[in-house]
UniProtKB/Swiss-Prot annotation:
Subunit and partners: Component of the heterotrimeric canonical replication protein A complex (RPA).
Record's function text: As part of the replication protein A (RPA/RP-A), a single-stranded DNA-binding heterotrimeric complex, may play an essential role in DNA replication, recombination and repair. Binds and stabilizes single-stranded DNA intermediates, preventing complementary DNA reannealing and recruiting different proteins involved in DNA metabolism.
Classification of source organism: Eukaryota, Fungi, Dikarya, Ascomycota, Taphrinomycotina
Organism of this sequence: Schizosaccharomyces pombe (strain 972 / ATCC 24843) (Fission yeast)
Entry protein name: Replication factor A protein 1
Record family assignment: Belongs to the replication factor A protein 1 family.
Comp. bias regions, Polar residues: 130-152
Length: 609
């Protein structure tokens, strides 16, 4: 089987530019490993794959559009793959092969590791090899000047990564002729062009604060490999806002590539673009070569198991259209137009979706049409519902498989069906009428609390043994009775719910803690009110420490550990990407009353005799 491998391909990819890349190399998979990620973020899983050509091995990242190959157990250790599209990026001073397209060669089966592949040479070895080549013959064009191999040591300087496998479209001459996939973009490249469809365009937003005033807009861009957000400020608003039209395809070049602020956008990409003075944008002649939209649908039944404030995609049949209503914000006294519509799907559930502003006023879709929503927020007011954000998109009767299947189901049996609603989920123990019985951790797990259709409530005596230090808070709206996440608009913070901008957010806790007792350990979710009691600081104060005094922040986290409390908890089923699990949330805590605990133990001993 070794003769089928593209021997030496990884070395060529590591040291050459795209013009010298071997076409569609065949490699063997040595390992497939899921990267650690925050399961509550909603981001897709990422996988690291080590590939071998029998002489060398290289670390690679799998494009999220290929995740299904891992889930279906097709991409596994020992399998053989043929790369059809890839690029090379520099990440943390290492070259990483980004796999954007591949075919699993199932006919070759699965085998033990072929040969004894080694990591590619270190920087010094590569330089020595290149010097020998230069002495033997004229220098070959396209040799990478990067000082890092796929597994190289840290170097003093980092050069841009070589470009990926490319296509040459009939693009304007002033633009680069190399078409990069969106997922291949990184800050380490400066000559690229993407061909992407505008799936969402915001309105022009204005801000005024102590540092001045300005305006901005943003667009979501989509191609076959993924999505990315692009933002323009001030002069770039005047230059590009009217050019970019929602739904159209463009060639875009010469933007700045920045690390994405993921807490402020629902676009799943490590990077984001910023339009600059030299940015070039031209409309593509072929408007059909790029997909219209990319969805990751959650069924309406599963919406009840999704965390509040999560941003998801849904699809349903429009069953009811409510009238336009005007509401007044208590915080700003400003009026807002809204409209509630109802959609249903084949899981037997209905869901209220709230439209806002211009979308609500101009909505004229006929009932029984198919509506696909991308990036709507999950609410928990008067039962589970959904709400469109300024970044959300709505497609009517989209030409996708899910739409056709849903239409067929509704015409065949769904039209006369009765649909269920998700009931109101109370956020406090006092309003549930349930007894919070004292349990130890082993009893909570053995009794499978939270696995029934309704939440279970219990009391737990335990000690905090660990606090996750990542994502302990989020920027919230400072208006009374709002608490929604706000988004950085480049000098101000915008609340979608209040439709207002603020100079600064008010941070609120979202902490994950590990609590232990004599029978085991349990992970609990903690929100703002309880977080203040545990940390003895507000989330604003802790965020300031995290940004300005790392040692003080770490000391504060350490001091909050190994403290005993009585935790009042809720256990509820949570469906995350098709996997059922139980989420435990702390509703309130109490300091230990040792006198009362002693009496409790005495009563327990006496009852056991």
């Amino acid at each position: 089987m070794a003769e089928r491998l593209s021997v030496g391909a990884l070395r060529i990819i590591n040291t050459s530019d795209a013009s010298s890349f071997p076409p569609n190399p065949i490699l063997q998979v040595l390992t497939v490993k899921e990267l650690n990620s925050n399961p509550t973020s909603g981001a897709p899983k990422r996988y690291r794959v080590v590939l071998s050509d029998s002489i060398n091995y290289a670390q690679s990242m799998l494009s999220t559009q290929l995740n299904h190959l891992v889930a279906e157990n097709k991409l596994q250790k020992g399998a053989f793959v043929q790369l059809t599209q890839f690029t090379v990026n520099v990440m943390k001073e290492r070259k990483i092969l980004i796999v954007l397209g591949l075919n699993v060669l199932t006919e070759l089966g699965v085998m033990d590791k072929i040969g004894n592949p080694a990591g590619l040479e270190t920087v010094d070895a590569l330089r020595q090899q290149q010097n020998e080549q230069n002495n033997a013959s004229a220098p070959r064009t396209g040799i990478s000047t990067s000082t890092n191999s796929f597994y190289g040591n840290n170097a003093a300087a980092t050069a841009p990564a070589p470009p990926p496998m490319m296509k040459k479209p009939a693009a304007p001459n002033s633009l680069s002729t190399i078409i990069y996939p969106i997922e291949g973009l990184s800050p380490y490249q400066n000559k690229w062009t993407i061909r992407a469809r505008v799936t969402n365009k915001s309105e022009v937003k204005h801000w005024h604060n102590q540092r001045g005033e300005g305006k901005l807009f943003s667009v979501n861009l989509l191609d076959e490999s993924g999505e990315i957000r692009a933002t323009g400020f001030n002069d770039q608003v005047d230059a590009f806002y009217d050019i970019l039209q929602e739904g159209s395809v463009y060639y875009i070049s010469r933007c700045r590539v920045n690390i994405a602020k993921k807490q402020y956008t629902n676009v799943q990409n490590e990077y984001e673009l910023m339009f600059e003075r030299d940015t070039e944008i031209r409309k593509a002649e072929d408007q059909t070569a790029v997909p219209v939209a990319k969805f990751s649908f959650v069924s309406l039944q599963e919406v009840g198991d999704v965390a509040k404030d999560a941003v998801i995609d849904v699809i349903g049949v429009l069953q009811n259209v409510g009238p336009v209503q005007q509401i007044t914000s208590r915080a700003t006294s400003r009026g807002f137009d809204k409209r509630d519509i109802t959609i249903v799907d084949q899981t037997g559930y209905e869901m209220r979706v709230t439209l806002w502003g211009k979308t609500a006023i101009e909505f004229s879709v006929s009932e029984e049409s198919i509506l696909a929503f991308k990036g709507v927020k999950v609410n928990d007011f008067q039962g589970r519902s959904l709400s469109m954000l300024t970044s959300s998109t709505m497609s009517v009767d989209p030409d996708i498989q899910e739409s056709h299947l849903l239409k067929g189901w509704y015409d065949g049996q769904g039209r006369g069906q009765e649909f269920a609603k998700h009931s109101v989920i109370s956020s406090t123990l006092s309003t549930t009428g349930r007894s919070a019985e004292r349990k130890n951790i082993a009893e909570v797990q053995a009794e499978h609390l939270g696995m029934s259709e309704t939440p279970d409530y219990f009391s737990l005596k335990g000690t905090i043994v660990y606090i996750r230090k990542k994502n302990v808070s989020y920027p919230a709206c400072p208006a009374a009775d709002c608490n929604k996440k706000v988004f950085d608009q480049g000098g101000s913070w915008r609340c979608e719910k209040c439709n207002k901008e603020y100079d600064a957010p008010q941070y609120r806790y979202i902490i994950t803690i590990a609590v232990g007792d004599h029978t085991g350990q349990l992970w609990l979710n903690v929100f703002d009110d309880v977080g203040k009691l545990i940390m003895h600081k507000t989330a604003d104060e802790l965020n300031d420490l995290q940004e300005n005094d790392e040692n003080a922040f770490m000391n504060c986290m350490a001091e909050a550990c190994y403290m005993p409390y009585i935790f009042q908890c809720r256990a509820k089923q949570d469906n995350f990407k098709g996997e059922m699990r139980v989420r435990y949330t702390v509703m309130s805590i109490n300091q230990m009353d040792w006198k009362e605990e002693s009496k409790r133990l005495i009563n327990f001993i006496e009852s056991a005799q």
